Amino acid sequence: MASKSNDFYFNAFVEQSEFSIQIVEKVKNIFENYNTINLRTSMDEVHLLEHTADIKHHEIMEKLSKEFIPPIEREDIVVLTQLLDDLTDYLEDIPILLYTYHVKTIDQAMMQFMDVIDQSVHQVTKLLSVFGDFKKDLTIHKYIIDINRLEENGDILFHEFMYKVFEEEHDARYLIGQKEMFTKFEGILDTAEDIANEVGNIIMKNS
């Protein structure tokens, strides 16, 4: 676990997750200072971050294609780096959906869901920051549990918010937009949970 080649993958996973933090912070800023006039510019800024994250993903895959003996199973590296890439992709979708569905305001439900997403993305980075030392670090399982708990919280919020929206609103376009937004939010938390579970599976196989 000490060679530079081994360190590359674990460090790269952290770098991928840090792009998700940058995007989620940008999206939070969009929510907190919501202005439809500036939305296209914000979308471009988020896309630039996502594109840079894509480059890191391709860098990992290129190195793996030339690697003789990777530190963990090749298939596990592929799955984990793809999940991390998916996370940045799904986060990028948030401002795109705001634009596509002409969302006029950010309500409390969206802010509350975004807070859970923010926590989950930060926990993913904390998890991956200790992943390279998984045989010694005792905090790793705490992060996995935390991410799973946040996903469960997201499920509860999703069902509560969707029930409320369909009970109170009757405009079809608004309902479609809200459903797409909340489904995307839930998908982001599901992906974070998939990352945590994949890390847990890798640890089990290598312990």
For the regions a language model picked out, list residue spans one by one.
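Cytosolic, long alpha-helical scaffolding segments
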Residues: 1-207
